[in-house]
Curated annotation (Swiss-Prot):
Cellular location(s): Virion; Host cytoplasm; Host nucleus
Ranges where the record places region Disordered: 418-525
InterPro entries per record: Paramyx_ncap
Motif (Nuclear localization signal): 70-77
Ncore: annotated span: 1-403
Quaternary structure and partners: Homomultimer; forms the nucleocapsid. Binds to viral genomic RNA. N0 interacts (via Ncore) with the phosphoprotein (via N-terminus); this interaction allows P to chaperon N0 to avoid N polymerization and non-specific RNA binding before encapsidation. Interacts (via the Ntail) as N-RNA template with the phosphoprotein (via C-terminus XD); this interaction maintains the P/L complex anchored to the nucleocapsid template during the sequential transcription.
Modified residue annotations for Phosphothreonine: T279
Role this protein plays: Forms the helical nucleocapsid (NC) in a ratio of 1 N per 6 ribonucleotides, protecting the genome from nucleases. The nucleocapsid (NC) has a helical structure with either 12.35 or 11.64 N per turn, approximately 20 nm in diameter, with a hollow central cavity approximately 5 nm in diameter. The encapsidated genomic RNA serves as template for transcription and replication; encapsidation by N is coupled to RNA synthesis. Forms the encapsidation complex with the phosphoprotein protein P. Before encapsidation, the newly synthesized free N protein, so-called N0, is chaperoned by P.
Protein name from the UniProt record: Nucleoprotein
Residue ranges with Basic and acidic residues bias: 433-452
Record GO cellular component, one term: viral nucleocapsid
Record's keyword terms, sorted: Capsid protein, Helical capsid protein, Host cytoplasm, Host nucleus, Host-virus interaction, Phosphoprotein, Ribonucleoprotein, RNA-binding, Viral nucleoprotein, Virion
Molecular function terms from GO: RNA binding; structural molecule activity
Organism: Measles virus (strain Edmonston-AIK-C vaccine)
Length: 525
């Protein structure tokens, strides 16, 4: 049996182990397409700001092709470094594309104000064609979908600080799109707006340079459909993280946005570890969880073997991502979701609509949290040096806290209900007026006589015998009553019974000194 268990553990490790790079064959390369990336050819701030302005307009042009749009985005993403060309060449290793760098300098002879650097060759016309300044219709389209503030005509500046603020504002909006461009593009707008508000409050971005929704949709769609662009963005994030010492302000902002990008699409795996294993509830000892716990252990080892690209496996379309889906450990995932819903309010909006979701183990997780509330782990208490008296105090406080939390979360919801009091007079009852009022009083008096003589079991028959059959009860229901006499009869019967009961309560209340008054507290008790 021991040999079988060792073989099983070895099998599980090798099953999820990534293939080892070996063999005589070379790297497999696909059919590449060329991407032209414009970069500044000098260190002038005017050149960079003008290039940024032209690229933003170019991306807003709906007629731009996909590879050209990718090149423009890569050019903007690399503008914050001192040498964009060196950065692109260093971090780019894509088997699907071939990047061509074009240095851009200022020019007074072109409509775009820029030209491609060359030795003795006039490239103004080619630059105008690239930046869509060759015809007025395309120029007008390039302005569509730009900034929300229409008073901003251009973003050309000569001040390095102002350029960094404008560039950082645009880059923040682009990088935030990567967080949900692949995993949840339909619900991305709300989270992107929250990130924008956060960075606006922190003065990291300038609110006036908020880009229009259509421009952001174009960029988000391109990020979602172009793997090469996502590879470049992930490689740039990893390169920034590996940089020692202090980083530029824009680089630090990119690292901050990375906290929303990292582990995108891996929520099931991460939350199962957080709520299913790290909470260390005794339910982990169930035999049903034994196999899935072994699977999770193998996946955690595989995650570590993948290295620094593991948190980005979904954005990088790594085929190994399917092993980390919740379908590989459905029972443990369902249990962890139940634990998470009870522990964190933010888990309440999570979508559990999966075919492998097991409600029984979900409820198991909920019950484990509820019944374990206030208990102190003996192992953890011994490690922290907590005495038995302190543990009892913590348990008592935690129990009261949990009860308060439950009462606030699922407390009784009281409706707007009015109660009939024993001391309420006839004048305070709803009046119908005229003949109807007299008929109701007469019927109610006869109902009291019938109640005294025959008891409550036969009082309803006496009330039904004196029911006015042809009189509508309310002006709002008059048309309905005239169309259906039976409905009118039933409505009148119900109202008369209610008023008769009110009269009986009045008589019973007159025999006692203190009338019974009903309120919400009596009902809850």
């Amino acid at each position: 049996m021991a040999t079988l268990l060792r073989s099983l553990a070895l099998f599980k490790r090798n099953k999820d182990k990534p293939p080892i790079t070996s063999g005589s064959g070379g790297a497999i390369r696909g059919i590449k397409h060329i991407i032209i990336v414009p970069i500044p050819g000098d260190s002038s701030i005017t050149t960079r700001s003008r290039l940024l302005d032209r690229l933003v307009r170019l991306i807003g042009n709906p007629d731009v092709s996909g590879p050209k749009l990718t090149g423009a985005l890569i050019g903007i993403l690399s503008l914050f470094v001192e040498s964009p060309g060196q950065l692109i060449q260093r971090i780019t290793d894509d088997p699907d594309v071939s990047i061509r760098l074009l240095e851009v300098v200022q020019s007074d002879q072109s409509q775009s104000g820029l030209t491609f650097a060359s030795r003795g060759t006039n490239m103004e016309d080619e630059a105008d064609k690239y930046f869509s300044h060759d015809d007025p219709i395309s120029s007008d389209q390039s302005r569509f979908g730009w900034f929300e503030n229409k008073e901003i005509s251009d973003i050309e500046v000569q001040d390095p600080e102002g350029f960094n603020m404008i560039l950082g504002t645009i880059l923040a909006q682009i990088w935030v799109l990567l967080a949900k461009a692949v995993t949840a593009p339909d619900t991305a707008a709300d989270s992107e707006l929250r990130r924008w508000i956060k960075y606006t409050q922190q003065r990291r971005v300038v609110g006036e340079f908020r880009l229009e929704r259509k421009w952001l949709d174009v960029v988000r769609n391109r990020i979602a459909e172009d793997l090469s662009l996502r590879r470049f963005m992930v490689a740039l994030i990893l390169d920034i993280k590996r940089t020692p010492g202090n980083k530029p302000r824009i680089a630090e902002m990119i690292c901050d946005i990375d906290t929303y990008i990292v582990e995108a699409g891996l929520a099931s795996f991460i939350l199962t570890i957080k709520f299913g294993i790290e909470t260390m509830y005794p339910a982990l000892g169930l035999h049903e969880f034994a196999g899935e716990l072994s699977t999770l252990e193998s996946l955690m080892n595989l995650y570590q073997q993948m290295g620094e690209t593991a948190p980005y496996m979904v954005n990088l379309e790594n085929s190994i991502q399917n092993k980390f889906s919740a379908g590989s450990y459905p029972l443990l995932w369902s249990y962890a979701m139940g634990v998470g819903v009870e522990l964190e309010n933010s888990m309440g909006g999570l979508n559990f609509g999966r075919s492998y979701f097991d409600p029984a183990y979900f409820r198991l997780g909920q019950e484990m949290v509820r019944r374990s509330a206030g208990k102190v782990s003996s192992t953890l208490a011994s490690e922290l040096g907590i005495t038995a008296e302190d543990a009892r105090l913590v348990s008592e406080i935690a129990m009261h806290t949990t009860e308060d939390k439950i009462s606030r979360a699922v407390g009784p919801r009281q409706a707007q209900v009015s109660f009939l009091h024993g001391d309420q007079s006839e004048n305070e009852l709803p009046r119908l007026g005229g003949k109807e009022d007299r008929r109701v009083k007469q019927s109610r008096g006869e109902a009291r006589e019938s109640y005294r003589e025959t008891g409550p079991s036969r009082a309803s028959d006496a009330r039904a015998a004196h029911l006015p059959t042809g009189t509508p009860l309310d002006i709002d229901t008059a048309s309905e009553s005239s169309q259906d006499p039976q409905d009118s009869r039933r409505s009148a019967d119900a109202l008369l019974r209610l008023q008769a009961m009110a009269g009986i309560s009045e008589e019973q209340g007159s025999d006692t000194d203190t009338p019974i008054v009903y309120n919400d507290r009596n009902l809850l008790d």
